[in-house]
């Protein structure tokens, strides 16, 4: 039976909690973080360290996962677009673009 691998952009507290919850559901996780000492490193099945704009690291991450989410809104929009062209990103990158600007976010809501 196919079990998708969940990619998580960001390895802070929320990324760690997401990896812990996924493990309880027998879902493998890979965390991509721009911090080598990210706490998510200790809760995921695999870990990719690199700048969120490093295309080689982005490709390494994409190769390891089936579907991607992110733990916070400060992932560069362009990075999410690049990833979304290869693998599905949820929430969609256009939502991230809205929440990166609090005035746009208020208008959207």
Language model segments and positions:
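ATP-binding N-terminal substructure of ATP-dependent carboxylate-amine bond-forming enzymes
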Residues: 1-107
């Amino acid at each position: 039976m196919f079990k998708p691998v969940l990619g998580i952009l960001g390895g802070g507290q929320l990324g760690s909690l997401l990896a812990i919850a996924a493990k309880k559901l027998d879902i493998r996780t890979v965390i991509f973080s721009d911090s080598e000492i990210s706490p998510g490193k200790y809760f995921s099945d695999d870990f990719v360290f690199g700048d969120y704009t490093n295309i080689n690291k982005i490709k390494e991450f994409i190769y390891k996962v089936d579907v991607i989410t992110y733990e916070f809104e400060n992932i560069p929009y362009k990075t999410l677009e690049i990833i979304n062209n290869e693998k599905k990103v949820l929430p969609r990158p256009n939502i991230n673009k809205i929440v990166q600007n609090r005035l746009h976010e208020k208008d959207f809501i």
